[in-house]
C-alpha cells in the first residue's frame, strides 16, 4: 500500500514539475516580449537610430513597388501611356494657371479704386461720410436710453482727445499683428514703418512673363529719400521637363529688390561695432571700427542673388524660401484684407483653423492616454511620474 502511495506521489510530483516548467516557460516568454518592447522603445529614442531609419525610408521614396516591377511588359506599356496622359494634364493645368494670372490682372484693376480710397482714408486725404462710416455691430439687447447715453459718453471722450489724422500707424499695426511679418521687425524698424502709407501689388502686362511687384509707398522721412520701395517676384507656370509630375501650379523662380538711398547715419541694415586689438609684440592696444550686417525688415529689399547655375548654399536657400512665402502672403492676404489684419479679425479666423487642428490633436492624445491606462507594459519617460503622465 505504501509503495502504491509513493508511486502515486512520484507521478504527482512529476506532473507538478511539468506544470511548473510550462509556467516558467510562459513567464520567460513574457519577459522576453517585455524586454523586446523596452529595447525597441530605447532604440526609438536614440537620435542616431532614428536618423538611420529616416535615411532608409527616404531612400525608399519613389522606389517602384514589387507589384509594379512584376507586371507583364504589355501592362507596363499601358502604364507608360497613362503617364504620358498625366504629362498632358500637367500642361493643361499650366495653361489654366496662366489664365488665372490674366484674371488676377483684370480684377486687380477693378479692386484698385477701392484700395486707393482705403489709402486716402488711412492717410487723411479723404474723410469718409457718415453713411460710409456706418457699420452694423452685433450688440446685446439694451434699451434705447442706455444706447443713447453710451453714444454721448463716447462722443464726449472723442472731443477730449486730440483729433488724429487718418488712421495712424495703420501698416505698422498690421505688420505687428501678423506673426510672419512681426518676426522680421526689429525695434529700429518701427519708426520707419510709421511712415509707410500704402502697399500695392502690380501684375506683369499681358503677354509678358508671369511676375508681380510689391510697391511700398512712404511719406517723406528722415531715414531715406525713396518714395517707393519695390520687390519683384518672377514666376513660372510650366512643368519641368525633367520632372513633370512635380508640377503643382506656378512657382516663384526668383526675386529682385531695390536700392535704398539711406540718409547719412540712418541705414538700419548695417551696424558699426568696435573691437579692441592687442599687438602681440609691443603690447599696444588699438580700437578697430567695423561695419557688419544688422537684422532688419528692410533686408527684405536685398534678397540673395540666385547664380546662373541655380545652386544656392543652405542659408541663402532658406532666406529665399521664407522670402517667397512672405511675398505671396503680402499679395494674397495682407494687401486685399489689410483692415481685417489691422483689427485682428483675420487673425482670429486663422486661429480658428488652427484650433480645429488642435482639437484633433487633443483627441489623439486622449487615445494615447487610454492606451497607457490599458497597457501593463507602459513606462513613463525618465524624470516623469506615471501620475503626472496621466494628469497632463
Curated annotation (Swiss-Prot):
Record Gene3D superfamilies: 1.20.5.1500, Nucleosome assembly protein
Q: Where is this motif: NAP1L motif?
A: 126-150
Mind telling me which GO cellular component terms the entry cites? Answer: chromatin; cytoplasm; nucleus
What's one Pfam family here?
A: NAP
The top of its lineage is: Eukaryota, Metazoa, Chordata, Craniata, Vertebrata
- Record keyword Nucleus present: yes
Q: In which tissues is it expressed?
A: Initially expressed throughout the embryo with expression higher at the animal pole. Becomes localized to presumptive ectoderm by gastrula stages. By stage 18 (neurula), expressed in the neural plate and posterior to the cement gland. In late neurula/early tailbud stages, expressed in the neural crest, neural tube, eyes, tailbud and ventral blood islands. Adult expression is predominantly in ovaries.
Record PTM: Phosphorylated by cyclin B-cdc2 kinase complexes.
Keywords, in A-Z order: Cytoplasm, Developmental protein, Differentiation, Nucleus, Phosphoprotein, Spermatogenesis, Transcription, Transcription regulation
A molecular function (GO) held by this record is: chromatin binding
Superkingdom in the source lineage: Eukaryota
- Identify its protein family: Belongs to the nucleosome assembly protein (NAP) family.
Q: What function does the entry list?
A: Acts as a chaperone for the linker histone to facilitate deposition of histone B4 onto linker DNA. Required for both remodeling of sperm chromatin into nucleosomes, and linker histone binding to nucleosome core dimers. Plays a role in tissue-specific gene regulation. Required for primitive hemopoiesis, acting upstream of tal1/scl.
Gene coding for it: nap1l1-a
List locations, semicolon-separated.
Cytoplasm; Nucleus
Biased amino acid composition, Acidic residues: 13-30, 346-377
Instruction: List this protein's GO terms for biological process.
Output: nucleosome assembly; positive regulation of transcription by RNA polymerase II; primitive hemopoiesis; spermatogenesis
Could you tell me which InterPro entries the record lists for this protein? NAP-like_sf, NAP_family
Map out region (Disordered) in residue numbers: 1-37, 346-392
Q: Give the protein's recorded name.
A: Nucleosome assembly protein 1-like 1-A
User: According to the UniProt entry, where does the motif Nuclear localization signal sit in this chain?
Assistant: 273-279
Q: Where is the signal peptide?
A: none
Asked if Protease is a keyword of the record, the answer is: no
Primary location class = cytoplasm
Q: What is known of its domains?
A: The NAP1L motif is required for the histone chaperone activity.
- Give the record's subunit note: Forms homomultimers. Interacts with histone B4. Interacts with the B-type cyclins ccnb1 and ccnb2.
Amino acid at each position: 500500500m505504501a509503495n502504491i502511495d509513493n508511486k502515486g506521489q512520484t507521478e504527482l510530483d512529476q506532473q507538478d514539475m511539468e506544470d511548473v516548467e510550462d509556467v516558467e516557460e510562459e513567464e520567460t516568454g513574457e519577459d522576453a516580449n517585455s524586454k523586446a518592447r523596452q529595447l525597441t522603445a530605447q532604440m526609438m529614442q536614440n537620435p542616431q537610430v532614428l536618423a538611420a531609419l529616416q535615411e532608409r525610408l527616404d531612400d525608399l521614396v519613389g522606389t517602384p513597388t514589387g507589384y509594379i516591377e512584376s507586371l507583364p511588359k504589355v501592362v507596363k506599356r499601358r502604364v507608360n501611356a497613362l503617364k504620358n496622359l498625366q504629362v498632358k494634364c500637367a500642361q493643361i493645368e499650366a495653361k489654366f494657371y496662366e489664365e488665372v494670372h490674366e484674371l488676377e490682372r483684370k480684377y486687380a484693376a477693378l479692386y484698385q479704386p477701392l484700395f486707393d480710397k482705403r489709402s486716402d482714408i488711412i492717410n487723411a486725404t479723404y474723410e469718409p461720410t457718415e453713411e460710409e462710416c456706418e457699420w452694423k455691430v452685433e450688440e446685446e439687447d439694451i434699451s434705447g436710453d442706455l444706447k443713447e447715453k453710451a453714444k454721448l459718453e463716447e462722443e464726449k471722450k472723442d472731443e477730449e482727445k486730440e483729433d488724429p489724422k487718418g488712421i495712424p500707424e495703420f501698416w505698422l499695426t498690421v505688420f505687428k499683428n501678423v506673426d510672419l511679418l512681426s518676426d522680421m521687425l526689429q525695434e529700429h524698424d518701427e519708426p520707419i514703418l510709421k511712415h509707410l502709407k500704402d502697399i500695392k501689388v502690380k501684375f506683369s502686362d499681358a503677354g509678358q512673363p508671369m511676375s508681380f511687384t510689391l510697391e511700398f509707398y512712404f511719406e517723406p522721412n528722415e531715414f531715406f529719400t525713396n518714395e517707393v520701395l519695390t520687390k519683384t517676384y518672377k514666376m513660372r507656370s510650366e512643368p519641368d521637363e525633367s520632372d513633370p509630375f512635380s508640377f503643382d501650379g506656378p512657382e516663384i523662380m526668383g526675386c529682385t529688390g531695390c536700392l535704398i538711398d539711406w540718409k547719412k547715419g540712418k541705414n538700419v541694415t548695417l551696424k558699426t561695432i568696435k573691437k579692441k586689438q592687442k599687438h602681440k609684440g609691443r603690447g599696444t592696444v588699438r580700437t578697430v571700427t567695423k561695419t557688419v550686417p544688422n537684422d532688419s525688415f528692410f533686408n527684405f529689399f536685398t534678397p540673395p542673388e540666385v547664380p546662373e547655375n541655380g545652386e544656392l548654399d543652405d542659408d541663402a536657400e532658406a532666406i529665399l524660401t521664407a522670402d517667397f512665402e512672405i511675398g505671396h502672403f503680402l499679395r494674397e492676404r495682407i494687401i486685399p484684407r489689410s483692415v481685417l489684419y489691422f483689427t485682428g479679425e483675420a487673425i482670429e479666423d486663422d486661429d480658428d483653423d488652427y484650433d480645429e487642428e488642435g482639437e484633433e490633436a487633443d483627441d489623439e492624445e486622449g487615445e494615447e492616454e487610454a492606451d497607457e491606462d490599458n497597457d501593463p507594459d507602459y513606462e513613463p519617460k525618465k524624470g516623469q511620474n506615471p501620475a503626472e503622465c496621466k494628469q497632463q
